[in-house]
């Protein structure tokens, strides 16, 4: 059956700032306390979406979350009106304010893990929301992510959205950033590669930085998503690269159809894994980047593998990269050799995503891949699909509501909270989502 990969990109939120909240993510730590530009961040993301849509790649948008997220501050013991809660937390414990104001939901590669209908036992598209419990600021995302996915994929005959796994370390799940799908045409059954960093009883794990994904979580997600057990492989990420800042697998590998583009040191027991994939995926091609050409350190600083590998109708592929790759002589030299070599990659497309990159999120972090048949595509909420009208409307919306300068101190401004709620109210109407945000269901509560 014919099917297409649709990229659903996260729209950067109004409170995008640099707080260094993500231990193990070296870009996040390095840019801590710098001044951010939320308006520019949102526009950089929108331009990527529109450019790819114009090039013929189906593209949609997932809206930001409500931030600062006052309900969690109340759970932490801060009371009074919303303004009083903000004032108290800013004075008594500003680190909590930064956490509940994070714009991290923009990285929708961590929103959920997807199983296309060609891979599932019941023939539906399945989504399991990620619990993201390794980081407090990200663990706050699951409930609203679930509401948003249900508003976008609202046909229960075709889509099944599962709640996140229990919030315990044993079941740490980071979503599609640790998941690849390999195979022929998108509509054919594919091989799902779940990548984990640790498992109970296995001493092979990183020592410097946390392994956020567990094998136990990956196995549970595969069950929830009703993936045919014959179409699943579980593989461990190389713990040494996690300790070098590769906090998700999408920082060291990216797949599309029959191609796996990865670093030579991406996986534990890599040669064994690649042999398994060759045996089980028709026409499988591994493009392994040797450490002698691109080091793991250069991989992390340029986000070479946090790229998008997109298929054209003729079978050739475009590699979507952050600007940092072009600015690194060694990486850019390798990429031009790759273009000249015998493989499906025929074009490099570079985007300026500096605002997101400075927090450790490249092109792949910003998108959630969903393979859909024509019938399933028609069942998606049409208001989220990128086109000229939506692009212009979202740019106008960003111009109206987003600040061009934000520091950690600005997060205590009650006006920022009001601006954010008004903006999301307008956006949820624009995207025909209904009341997906807690403040909408509670009737506002600004006072």
Curated annotation (Swiss-Prot):
Biological process annotations from GO: arginine catabolic process to glutamate; arginine catabolic process to succinate
Domain of life of the organism encoding this protein: Bacteria
Recorded metabolic or biological pathway in which this protein acts: Amino-acid degradation; L-arginine degradation via AST pathway; L-glutamate and succinate from L-arginine: step 2/5
Sites where the protein binds substrate: 19-28, 110, 137-138, 212, 250, 359
UniProt-recorded Gene Ontology molecular function terms: N-succinylarginine dihydrolase activity
InterPro entries: AstB_sf, SuccinylArg_d-Hdrlase_AstB
Record-annotated disulphide pairs: none
Alphabetical UniProt keywords: Arginine metabolism, Hydrolase
Main EC class the enzyme belongs to: hydrolase
EC nos: 3.5.3.23
Catalytic reaction annotation: N(2)-succinyl-L-arginine + 2 H2O + 2 H(+) = N(2)-succinyl-L-ornithine + 2 NH4(+) + CO2
Keyword Hydrolase (UniProt): yes
Catalytic residues in the record: 174, 248, 365 (nucleophile)
Subunit structure, interactors included: Homodimer.
Assigned protein family: Belongs to the succinylarginine dihydrolase family.
The protein's role, per its UniProt record: Catalyzes the hydrolysis of N(2)-succinylarginine into N(2)-succinylornithine, ammonia and CO(2).
Protein known as: N-succinylarginine dihydrolase
The encoding gene: astB
């Amino acid at each position: 059956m014919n099917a297409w990969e649709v990229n659903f990109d996260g729209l950067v939120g109004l409170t995008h700032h640099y707080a260094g909240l993500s231990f193990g993510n070296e870009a996040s730590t390095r840019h801590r306390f710098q001044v951010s530009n939320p308006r520019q961040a949102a526009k950089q993301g929108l331009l990527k979406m529109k450019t790819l849509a114009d090039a013929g790649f189906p593209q949609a948008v997932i809206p930001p979350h409500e931030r600062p997220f006052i309900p969690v501050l109340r759970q932490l013991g801060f009371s009074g009106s919303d303004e009083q809660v903000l004032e108290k937390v800013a004075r008594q414990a500003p680190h909590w304010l930064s956490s509940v104001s994070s714009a991290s939901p923009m990285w929708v590669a961590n929103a959920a893990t997807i199983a296309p209908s060609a891979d599932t036992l019941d023939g539906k598209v399945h989504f399991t929301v990620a619990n993201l419990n390794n980081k407090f600021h990200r663990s706050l995302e699951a409930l609203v992510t679930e509401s948003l996915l249900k508003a976008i994929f609202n046909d229960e005959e075709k889509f099944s959205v599962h709640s996140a796994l229990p919030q315990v370390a044993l079941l740490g799940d980071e979503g599609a950033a640790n998941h690849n799908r390999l195979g022929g045409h998108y509509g054919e059954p594919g091989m799902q590669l779940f990548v984990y960093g640790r498992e109970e009883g296995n001493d092979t794990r990183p020592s410097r930085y946390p392994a956020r994904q567990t094998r136990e979580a990956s196995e549970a997600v595969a069950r929830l998503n009703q993936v045919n057990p014959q179409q699943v492989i579980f593989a461990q990420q190389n713990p040494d690269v996690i300790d070098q800042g590769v906090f998700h697998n999408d920082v060291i590998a990216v797949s599309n159809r029959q191609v796996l583009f990865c670093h030579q040191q991406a996986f534990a027991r890599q040669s064994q894994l690649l042999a398994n994939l060759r045996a089980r995926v028709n026409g499988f091609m591994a493009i392994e980047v040797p450490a002698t050409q691109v080091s793991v350190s250069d991989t992390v600083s340029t986000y070479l593998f946090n790229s998008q590998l997109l298929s054209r109708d003729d079978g050739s592929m475009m590699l979507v990269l952050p600007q940092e790759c072009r600015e690194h002589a060694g990486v850019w030299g390798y990429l031009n050799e790759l273009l000249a070599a015998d493989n499906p990659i025929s074009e490099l497309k570079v985007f300026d995503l500096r605002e997101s990159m400075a927090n450790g999120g490249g092109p792949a972090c910003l998108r959630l891949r969903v393979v859909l048949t024509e019938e399933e595509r028609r069942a998606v909420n049409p208001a989220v699909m990128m086109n000229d009208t939506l692009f212009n409307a979202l740019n106008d919306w960003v111009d109206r509501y987003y600040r061009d300068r934000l520091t950690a101190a600005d997060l205590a401004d009650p006006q920022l909270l009001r601006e954010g709620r008004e903006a999301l109210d307008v956006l949820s109407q624009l995207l025909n989502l209904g009341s997906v945000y807690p403040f909408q269901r509670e009737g506002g509560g600004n006072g």
